[in-house]
Design a protein with these regions (language model features):
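Non-ligating segments of multi-cofactor redox enzymes
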Residues: 1-466
Length: 466
């Protein structure tokens, strides 16, 4: 992520005295660089209370999520549109070249079937905003926002490697400031801010007098302007306390909304193997790896279906893609255990082990073709992957509008066999809103979210394990 920000910052930078003066000014330390430490402290306080909201701004999660759900689909769509346009120009040479280019890109870069995701305008827009800000201030993300950079800055006080300045040979040409990536004060006569340094070594490389050297156990020149030699993390005690308090308040605030438990969205279908909802949102870091690896494009980032705490966590949307019965990839790639890695036996079940259920199918008889319009249709039963099938028929003879008798097979669902994979909803020929749909009720991860509850602990209605 830092390398990408650096590349965006430096691409096609104009040269000249005016531009250099601007770079010198922007590369001096600014108070805005404190913000990342306050962000880190806020998220750390929230993490101590069991909420990994830091995944929203963690650079690894941010990069993986943005590339997988927004950047690659956009590139694929643009490339396919451009090559299709060239191919349709009617020129045989261009058409052949376009087809060859597409075949080459398809074998090296482009996926066989590009997935597309919900909410990429917000995810992609946020990522694009971060990149654009780097054009205004070099490495703005790293300097002002990145919580990982702030964490590394806190640990930098114990580093053995640092910058040594030679005030005697320095001619104050400011080349070091022009090349500096971290605004850490590499020039002689000012405090070198060790926590802000990215160790790019640019200042040492461009110094014409060799006045700057990075070495182990550097000798720090103590002067009136620089009495301590180096400067530790520059934060306000009052702001630190405010950040910690905000993190402590953030968790109950996020969970106080009705979407978290008492009025959860019935279409909030989590991936197979997911932990109970309260534990799931605590562990999920929104990296998007499960969405990227899903072969049927079934997993998508949520917005507010899971409440504010669950934003950008994965949800299965059967109308777009169903859960492949023998696939356990999402659990294999999950880095935090929010989605458990299931064996094939635990996923599909056998005589002694029940299958992992993520929901239950329901039939909307007002939209189902055999039920509502006496039109024969058996698609949902054909697509049902369970054995025996969870969708079964009752053959009935009905009278249509012309007073003719029509034999139709009307589907029903056996909730004891349905795993909620969504194949029936995905394949339903009622195109706008499927006549058979999945909700999360009956999911294996929750003992409360069931069709028929044997007992319920009314003293603790939020208890999912009772």
């Amino acid at each position: 992520m830092g390398s990408l920000n650096h590349w965006i910052s430096e691409i096609r930078r104009p040269r000249g005295e005016t531009i250099n003066a601007r770079k010198i000014k922007s590369n001096r330390y600014g108070k805005y660089q404190r913000i990342k430490y306050y962000i880190l402290l806020l998220f750390l306080a929230a993490a101590l209370l069991g909420s990994l909201q830091i995944g929203l701004l963690d650079p690894l999660s941010l990069l993986a999520r943005s590339i997988g759900t927004a950047v690659l689909p956009t590139i694929h769509t643009a490339a396919l549109g451009l090559l299709s346009w060239v191919k349709e120009l009617g020129l045989p040479i261009l058409a052949t070249a376009a087809q060859s280019t597409y075949d080459l890109l398809g074998s090296l870069l482009l996926p066989y079937r590009q997935a597309h995701f919900h909410g990429i305008l917000i995810i992609g827009g946020f990522f694009l905003t971060v990149l654009i800000l780097n054009r205004l201030i070099t490495r703005f993300w790293c300097r002002a926002i990145c919580p990982l950079g702030a964490l590394l800055g806190l640990f930098s006080r114990w580093t053995l490697f640092g910058l040594e300045k030679d005030e005697v040979t320095c001619n104050h040409c400011n080349q070091c400031l022009i090349a500096c990536q971290g605004a850490d004060g590499p020039d002689v006569g000012v405090v070198w801010r060790q926590p802000e340094c990215h160790l790019c070594l640019n200042c040492q490389a461009v110094c014409p007098q060799s006045s700057l050297k990075f070495k182990f156990y550097p000798q720090q020149t103590v002067t009136t302007a620089n009495p301590a030699g180096t400067q530790k993390v520059d934060v306000s005690r009052r702001a630190v306390m405010a950040s910690l308090a905000s993190g402590v308040v953030l968790v109950p605030l996020l969970r106080s909304g009705d979407a978290f438990e008492v009025n959860s969205d019935p279409r909030l279908i989590r991936p197979p193997g997911s932990l109970p909802e309260s534990q799931f949102v605590e562990r999920c870091i929104r990296c998007g790896q499960c969405m990227r690896v899903c072969p049927n494009n079934a997993l998508h980032p949520t917005m507010l279906q899971a409440g504010a705490e669950g934003i950008w966590s994965p949800v299965l949307i059967p109308r777009i893609g169903y859960c492949e019965p023998t696939c356990t990839l999402c659990g294999q790639v999950c880095p935090t255990g929010a989605i458990a890695e299931l064996s094939l036996v635990r996923k599909v079940g056998n005589e002694t082990v029940p299958p992992n259920r993520i929901g239950t199918a329901f039939i909307d008889r007002g939209r189902c073709l055999p039920w509502a319009m006496a039109i024969p249709c058996i698609v949902c039963e054909e697509w049902c992957p369970t054995s025996p099938k969870a969708v079964y028929f009752s053959e009935e003879t009905v009278v249509d509008r012309k007073k003719d008798e029509v034999k139709v097979k009307r589907p029903s669902v056996d909730p004891q066999l349905c795993t909620g994979c969504g194949a029936c909803e995905y394949a339903c020929p009622v195109t706008d809103r499927a006549a058979i749909y999945i909700t999360s009720v009956g999911e294996s991860r929750s003992k409360r979210n069931q069709l028929l509850l044997k007992t319920r602990n009314m003293s603790n209605p939020r208890d999912e394990t009772s």
